[in-house]
Amino acid sequence: TVSEEQMRKEIAVMKRLNFNAVRTSHYPNAVKWYDLCDELGIYLVDEANLETHGYGGQLSASAEWTAAYLERATRMVLRDKNHPSIVLWSLGNESGAGANHAAMHGWIREYDKIRSV
């Protein structure tokens, strides 16, 4: 577990190096990370817990996986929607492209008409 002190140090280094945004790749980070980004002025690209490396678009194109894909999108958005630092919702990492990604995108667009997807 990364301490709040360490998170603050990492954000301070990023700001010194003129970074203004980070991506929460592969999975959601600790809630405190989102809070600190809100407080300290770092933009976030929040990424759904979705990575299907090696499967290409097979799972994203399969109706058997639609509910699982949508659950990951809805969990992310409902959990993190009140963080002003989030500027973009990411549908996942190296997870192909297909109907299930389109369903995720559609749900997020309907729910959050402000942020990019």
Task: List the predicted regions and their residue ranges.
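Active-site-adjacent substrate/metal-binding segments within catalytic domains
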Residues: 1-103, 117
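Acidic-histidine catalytic/liganding microenvironments
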Residues: 83, 111-112
